[in-house]
Regions:
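Canonical Rossmann dinucleotide-binding motif of NAD(H)/NADP(H)-dependent dehydrogenases/reductases
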Residues: 1-16
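The beta1-alpha1 cofactor-binding region of Rossmann-like NAD(H)/NADP(H)-dependent oxidoreductases
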Residues: 42-54, 86, 210-211
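Catalytic Tyr-X3-Lys loop
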Residues: 66, 82-102, 116, 120, ...
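Conserved mid-core segment of classical short-chain dehydrogenase/reductases
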Residues: 75-90, 113, 131-134, 173-178, ...
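Short C-terminal tail/terminal secondary-structure segment
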Residues: 78, 216-217, 228-240
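Active-site helix of classical SDR
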Residues: 104, 138, 146
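Alpha-helical segment proximal to the catalytic Tyr-Lys
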Residues: 109, 151-155, 225
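A glycine/serine/threonine-rich, flexible loop-to-helix segment
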Residues: 155, 167-200
């Protein structure tokens, strides 16, 4: 998320950082220090109210929404499906599906009247993967949103596309997705995900943050003006 925001700002985008973490202020400061334009808002994107407030904030700041990047999500628990509790299944789907579902709805409310806009959903090649069935289901839903919504709004000037990242080398998260992971999942269960991700990638490695940000920014740009309704795998040859 940070890499996409900083690169977008460096190319002239007016960037609104939406996050519950206080780290959003650090990203805004870095963008401004580099000469870019950015602001932030703290809302819960797992709720309709939070998504609606975020979109309205962008409109209040700059009068319109040209690009929405839906980047909320991530596996909370890594384990075989029979070990998931019902509340954990609910939490995985709420984390990795509903922010995209709600933000798409909130964004098109502003994009449709202006007759233009691009939505880039961040999916995952893990729609076909081990030890994260609820997450896979949620990201499969993101792919379905992308295809179906694109069809509805294509003739009204809006593109809806998705990038599906594979394994990515990234620094530790500032706010862990699951602070109790060591107690709630076995190390070998998580290692299965790592091994499967590398095995499935033709390049046999994880990607970099820039290798993931580049396709997202391409899909958001006018260079992709004839692309909509598809999910582009960015996983070193793993199609998901």
């Amino acid at each position: 998320g940070r890499t996409v925001a900083e690169r977008a700002a460096s190319e002239g985008a007016l960037v609104l950082i939406v996050d519950r973490s206080d780290a959003r202020s650090e990203v805004v400061a870095a963008i401004r220090a580099a000469g870019g334009t950015a602001d932030d808002i703290s809302v819960d994107l797992e709720t309709w109210e939070g998504c609606s407030l975020a979109m309205q904030k962008a409109v209040d700041l700059w009068g319109r929404i040209d690009v929405l990047v839906n980047n909320v999500g991530g596996t909370i628990w890594a384990k075989p499906y029979e070990h998931y509790e019902p509340h954990q299944i609910d939490a995985e789907v709420r984390r990795s599906l509903f922010p995209t579902l709600y933000c798409c709805r909130a964004a098109i409310e502003h994009m449709l009247p202006q007759g233009s806009g691009v939505i880039v959903n961040v999916s995952s090649i893990a729609t076909r993967g081990l030890n994260r069935v609820p997450y896979a289901a949620a990201k499969g839903g993101v792919n379905a949103i992308t295809a179906s919504l694109a069809w509805e709004v294509a003739e009204r000037g809006i593109r809806v596309v998705a990038a599906a990242p594979g394994g990515t080398e990234a620094p530790p998260r500032i706010v862990p997705r699951n602070p109790n992971a060591e107690e709630e999942q076995r190390e070998d269960w998580y290692k299965t995900i790592v091994d499967q991700t590398i095995q499935s990638a033709l390049m046999k490695r994880y990607g970099t943050l820039d290798e993931q940000a580049g396709p997202i920014l391409f899909l958001a740009s006018d260079d992709a003006s004839y692309i909509t309704g598809v999910t582009v795998p960015v996983g070193g040859g793993d199609l998901g």
